[in-house]
Amino acid sequence: MNAAAPLPRPTLHARLLAEQALSRAAGAPLVAGNAVELLIDGAAHFAAWQAAIESARTHVFVENYIIADDPVGRELRAALVAAAQRGVRVCVIHDWLGNLGNARAAFWLPLRAAGGEVRVYNRLRADSPFGWISRDHRKLVLVDGVWGSLSGVCAAAKWLGDPTRGVPPWRDTGLVIRGPALGDLEQAYRDSWAGLGAPLDLAATPVPAPAGAIALRVIATHPQTAGLYRLDQLVAAMAQRTLWLTDAYFVGIPTYVQGLVSAARDGVDVRLLVPGSSNLHAVAALSRAGYRPLLEAGIRVFEWNGSMLHAKTAVADDRWARVGSSNLNLSSWLANLELDAAIDNEDFAGLMTEQYERDLANTTEIVLADGRRPRPSGAVPPRPRRAGGSSSRAAAGALRLANTVGAALSNRRVLGPSEGGALLAGGLLLVALAVLAVLLPQLLAWPLALLCGWIGASLLRKRLRLRRRRPPS
């Protein structure tokens, strides 16, 4: 827990204003009376899902970005098949792009044969060249309307790591929720299902009775709604003492980065924990390219030392926490279907703070070149021009070696030219395209012609649809 003195309790009026602002920003009401359990890493999630599905009596709803044809995915499918065979209504939504290369359509034949239903979100369509950008990135399991789990965990074996090769499990976070908030979770699922075909013909589950003392918001975002983005911005503005963020694919846009920078300059302890090694290398390069303005504002940045950090969490002032599927980037904020819970409870926020501190024990802190403290704005002296030579190169090599040894001993790494990787990749790509355009223009002409033709045909098709819908004059 944070050792600083506790913040003074806000007045009732101030608290009501804050709750109103958060509800309006997120587009989600605060629902009291819930019990919440914190799940850490894939194994805990898979065991909880399995036990809940085995206990199902009326219905099981599953929505996940990836359900892979591997031991974890097959075990989940077996539990769903068994539930369907004993008369439970089983409905599954998975993302087309997420499952591409992870499971074929035939993977679901046993469940369909048992009476289960499977729908796929946003297949690639000829009439929508850019429609594939929107993905169903949610991770949700609902059982009988009385048990629910949301998280960042997909149903795939890579979350368990590979003990035979010494690969540790992926680090991820999720929740089990019981209580009235399950009504909002089920409605979010029903909305997703109805967006892919006929609505569920199953009667809505009555709102569960209170199961605990935790108040939370279920934030079910859709493309272009930006509810979670507004909430994240508001939390950055409202934090008074701490704002500790964990994110798998952080690509901060200027407005959000400015919110974090303003909080840090106002004395808030802002921290960002991101992967040290990522399964999406391009995103990791973009993330590192944005470290410098954060560090210069006094924000502390940590990189995870394990195989992959996939959690998406926030905890502020030991009072407020968020857990779910949303990353701090434009894809999650504006393009995807995402699902998060924002929890207003000191005890739960305390658990999240303790977990964050445990996670920091397995990280390397990124620091500016002048050491522990950020360099004040305007304090960087101009670099003198020096003649090159073997001695300067040897000194630079010795400095890099010292930085490496120091990082290993202190769990700190000096921020190098982090923007260089992204700039190098972008520059080489553009130069290569320019060379191709000069030497082999037909190699670029054909893809460009196909893309223009695809977009043009899509626009003409939409125009015909509008014409057919026009009422006769």
Q: Where do the PLM segments sit?
A:
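A cytosolic-side transmembrane-helix exit/cap motif
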Residues: 463-473
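Charged, low-complexity intrinsically disordered terminal segments
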Residues: 1-442, 447-450, 454-460, 471
